[in-house]
Amino acid sequence: MNICRAQHTILPIVAVAMAFGLATIAAQRGGAGQAGGARGSGYSLSDPAPNDPALKGAIDLHAHQDPDSNGPSYGQAARSVDAIDLYKRAKAAGMRGFVIKEHLDQTAGLAYYMRKLYPDFEFFGGMGSNFTTGPKVNPWAIIHMAEIKGGWGRIVWMPSWDSEWSSHKVANYATHAAQLSKFFTPPFVSVAKCNSGGAFWANFPKPCANGELLPEVKDAIKLIATTKTRDSNGDLILATGHNSPEEDLMMIKDAVAAGVKHIILTHPLLDSVDMTDAQIKEAVGMGPEIYAEFTSFFCGPTVRPEVVTRYIGGIRAAGVDHAVITSDTGQLNSLFQPDALANCAKVLRTNGFTERELDAMLKINPAKILGIAQPQ
């Protein structure tokens, strides 16, 4: 377990070393850069990449990929694709970039090396405020990520895999929390408390009245607002993580007051958050650069119609100028990210969304959030 809990600053070194090793392997196995297909995905990376105009210039702000951890200690899903093979598929589909998402490590270092390997693509990284950065939200980890060479670490996710809300609400997270309880008390990372000092979720499923953010969360938000990344001089981005609607709204309110430039409301319709349309509308209405994220899980061929309807309603509640579509895939047996986004484009068209609206959610808004030039 100690190996799994290796320091936040050490694991990324392994990741970037693996990236160079993977680059060598990719070169040795030819232009396709694949070895038969994704593990258990049911189709091969060598299959043609999706050809959809909505993907030309698209940026995925939430792309899971290897190298990442998988094992009995943390329980997150194995990954179906590594950063190099994902780049090749995304590039073939005409995509412009993606953010390398991991719950447990910062990915600024991996983004730096991927940019050196493939300078024709926009790679960005981020970090999750989970136990690998400490038992509390850790402002120092944010500074560390921002000062990694290149400055390509941009998104700071509040607690996700280790959040207090998810550990109470979602069954597989509760199992995960039971593992963590062997090492940490409490076995989750909190973002809020009652004004009286008690636990925000002492009476789950109801939060306490008059809750407030923890001091370290407020400090982290201030850092996100005021810190520029090394070399590239970019702004940091707050993503709300897998926290409750009440906690998300508190964080967004505090972030707007602190001057955070861009805010992502992390997948508000997944079980790990579970917002209402009214709460989504309230969240994005707090400022001009707040964006609700809608992941591709509503776009699969076996998704129930009522789920699609729920997502369409959520997107309309946010408004396309305050919404982004992300894949959030990369798990074993899930669609590859470009394929998932192409599915979403089809579902959205079927439900009355125009090409301009698709461009807003897949190209224009992600570029705004990352502070890069708008698509031509």
Residue ranges and their predicted role:
Residues 11-23:
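Bacterial N-terminal signal peptides
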Residues 84-107, 120-131, 153-163, 236-239, ...:
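Divalent metal-dependent hydrolysis catalytic cores, especially in the metallo-beta-lactamase
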Residues 134-266:
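Extended substrate/RNA-proximal surfaces in nucleic-acid metabolism proteins
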Residues 234-306, 324:
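Catalytic pocket-lining loop regions of alpha/beta-barrel enzymes
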Residues 243, 320-336:
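Short acidic/histidine-rich active-site segments
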Residues 338-376:
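Mid-to-C-terminal alpha-helical segments outside catalytic/metal-binding sites
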